Design a protein with these regions (language model features):
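N-terminal beta-loop-helix "entrance" segment that forms/cooperates
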Residues: 42-58, 155
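A generic structural motif
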Residues: 32-38, 137
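Helix-loop-strand module that forms the ligand-binding subsite of alpha/beta enzymes
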Residues: 55-135
Length: 183
């Protein structure tokens, strides 16, 4: 019998019409029978402040409890100024504190994203990989930079072209294998 693993789906954007939210939706529509995606909100988290660690806000507890309950994390992010978005870095910081409650440690993490710039999310993903590695996450090797095309995702929320669909499906299959090995 094949297990099904809950996967925290973290979209590193707080825009309502985010390209990455659309990308995330298309990813969840792919064939991944062993993965069950849970959309984890990060836009309601207060800015990280060490003074709040002792009496953590309810939104922070909700976020960390949801991530902790998942077998892996898929982060879908834009790139801001050649790095990761502040809203995502804030969520990562809350998830890592205090150190003995770090939700990222030993957690399988896959990273992808799209941005309108010429190099997409290449530099931002490298920054995120470095941060997640320092926090003890098991970051899946290989890159998944998704070029932003006018028709990346169709009106039904699926990938508009077979090449992108096949590429992302292969990446998702590798992630499912990693999660299965580490869960």
């Amino acid at each position: 019998m094949t297990s099904t693993y809950p996967i925290a789906l973290v979209v590193g954007s707080n825009r309502r019409e985010s390209l990455n939210r659309k990308l995330a939706k298309a990813i969840t529509r792919l064939d991944a029978p062993t993965l069950r995606f849970q959309d984890i909100r990060i836009d309601d988290l207060p800015m990280y402040n060490g003074d709040l660690e002792a009496a953590r806000p309810a939104e922070v507890n909700r976020f960390t409890d949801e991530v902790r309950a998942c077998s892996g994390v898929l982060i879908v992010m834009p790139e801001h100024n050649r790095s990761l978005p502040a809203v995502l870095k804030n969520a990562i910081d809350w998830g890592s504190k205090p150190a003995d409650r770090n939700v990222w440690r030993d957690k399988p993490v896959a990273i992808t994203g799209t941005s309108p710039g010429a190099i997409g999310t290449a530099v931002g993903q490298q920054h995120l990989r470095q941060i997640m590695g320092i926090l003890g996450a098991t970051v899946m090797g290989g890159e998944a930079y998704i070029g932003n095309k006018p028709q990346l995702v169709d009106e039904q929320g699926s990938f508009a072209d077979d090449t992108t669909r096949a590429f992302v499906q292969a990446y998702l299959d590798r992630f499912a294998t990693l999660v299965g090995k580490l869960a």
